[in-house]
Amino acid sequence: MSSVAREWREIPGRYNLKGTKCENCGSIFFPARDFCPKCRRAGIRKVVPYNVCRTGKVYSFSVIHEAPDCNNAMKPYAVAMVQTDDGVLVSAQLVDVDLDKIEIGMPVRAVLRKLDADGASGVIHYGYKFVPNL
């Protein structure tokens, strides 16, 4: 079970694809980083908030046929690595698409959707998933 306070603290990254960008080398990171692993010491205090692009293309994907019991209702489902239009790789579930029609290079966009809930009367967790951008 998770806390409501923790959920609210994570909202920028979870709901809006908030990452960071190194002003020293220009690298973009998602999820956000506190320092640039490429620049190391030279990148300290040069990492700023960055809004990762919400559109991109499927870079790689997999269709999940066997899943944990908590995901039984949505089997089979697809997860994808999406390369956003600004070059960031984001892993997420791919929804609202026929599983047989998913292709590498397919244009997609991020949307806010329900991820899960802590029991029937618990906290509902929302986050990003990707849908076809037709």
Go through the PLM ranges and name each one:
Residues 56-58, 94:
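Conserved hydrophobic positions within beta-strands
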